[in-house]
Amino acid sequence: RTCPYAQRARLIIAAKGISADLVNVDLNKKPDHFFDLNPYGEVPVVLHNGGHVYESLIAAEYLEEAFPDPPLFAKEALVRANERIYFNHATK
């Protein structure tokens, strides 16, 4: 079973065609070093350019900003808001 929060990151990585190594973490047996990446021990954690980002929505925004092409959302504000609503429902 995949965590819905980690699924957000996976969906964005797939939609944007980002080359990534996906690592599954056993949420019942998290390795100690995982807490160095996220003090809360939650997924996802995105490692990129020597840094790391956690919290699923912040990670999603980071991936959109770090990999702008292709854009994940439309340019028009109302269309973009509706896309985010759909995305939010799809990843709950």
Curated annotation (Swiss-Prot):
The active site is at 3 (nucleophile). InterPro entries: Glutathione_S-Trfase_N, GST_Omega/HSP26, Thioredoxin-like_sf. Keywords: Oxidoreductase, Transferase. One of its GO terms (cellular component) is cytoplasm. GO terms for molecular function: glutathione dehydrogenase (ascorbate) activity; glutathione transferase activity; methylarsonate reductase activity. It catalyses: RX + glutathione = an S-substituted glutathione + a halide anion + H(+); L-dehydroascorbate + 2 glutathione = glutathione disulfide + L-ascorbate; methylarsonate + 2 glutathione + H(+) = methylarsonous acid + glutathione disulfide + H2O. Glutathione binds at residues 30, 43, 55-56. Residues 1-71 form the GST N-terminal domain. Its EC number is 2.5.1.18, 1.8.5.1, 1.20.4.2. The keyword Glycosyltransferase does not apply. Induction: By treatment with KCl and serotonin. Belongs to the GST superfamily. Omega family. Exhibits glutathione-dependent thiol transferase activity. Has dehydroascorbate reductase activity and may contribute to the recycling of ascorbic acid. Participates in the biotransformation of inorganic arsenic and reduces monomethylarsonic acid (MMA). This is Probable glutathione transferase. The lineage of its organism: Eukaryota, Metazoa, Spiralia, Lophotrochozoa, Mollusca.
